[in-house]
Amino acid sequence: MEMPIIKLKNFDGPFDLLLHLIKKNEMSITEIKIHEITKQYLEYIALMKELDLEITSEFIVMAATLIEIKSKSLLPKVKVEDETCEEDLQKILMEKLQEYKKFKKISAYLRERELSTGEVFTKKAEIIEVEADNKLDDDYFKNITMLDLYKLYNNLMRIYGEKQNVNVMEKKISVDKYKITDKINFLRDKLSEKSVVRFSEFIPQCECKLEVVVTFMAMLELIKRSEIKVIQYENFGEIMMEKVIVNE
């Protein structure tokens, strides 16, 4: 039999080499012919030695495992325990191979996303001038952490998703369509009609997630300006916005 190696490629590890041999021999991971794979695996390691390439202990351990499975398959099955041990060893190897293949696909996808992200250009944040007057002494952000805001945002996105139709329709959104200043004025108008409003009332009116985010940021800006205060009676509960009345 001729040596099956045509050229040597760089492998990330022993599982990478095994997957290459399985694909080369047109085998399924669940139906590997150990005797064929073992011989070719050892030939790869031998060639790596000839080329003075570094062979890590992981490759050697995998080779020993393959040899052990192969040798046990050739020995007569005297005891049931030996047969069970051999099957378990091969089963564990198959499971690890399947798991490695999944991670390899995920890493390839993430690598593609990393490359495509470099081609994305984002808009600079809007600069909002904050008026110094009408400030209250109470600091409404005192007991609020970034984690609280993140959880709150996720809850709002969940509510938004429940309000939408099951069939999602792709829309093109203009970059400047939703502005924080417009949403600030929108919230001011709503609070002028009634002093206390629920934030969830505005979600069904939003066309997309971006509009929900901009509305949420407008609410934070009004809190920062001390024009409103928010009340939440429980974690992930309803957000009540109340207009702050400053005594002159």
Swiss-Prot record:
Description of how the protein assembles with itself and partners: Component of a cohesin-like complex composed of ScpA, ScpB and the Smc homodimer, in which ScpA and ScpB bind to the head domain of Smc. The presence of the three proteins is required for the association of the complex with DNA.
Cellular component GO terms held in the UniProt record: cytoplasm
Function: Participates in chromosomal partition during cell division. May act via the formation of a condensin-like complex containing Smc and ScpB that pull DNA away from mid-cell into both cell halves.
Residue ranges of the TM segments: none
Species of the source: Clostridium perfringens (strain SM101 / Type A)
Family to which this protein belongs: Belongs to the ScpA family.
Keywords assigned by UniProt, alphabetized: Cell cycle, Cell division, Chromosome partition, Cytoplasm
Name of the featured protein: Segregation and condensation protein A
Principal location: cytoplasm
The keyword Cell cycle appears for this protein: yes
UniProt GO BP: cell division; chromosome segregation; DNA replication
Compartments where found: Cytoplasm
InterPro entries in the cross-refs: ScpA, ScpA-like_C
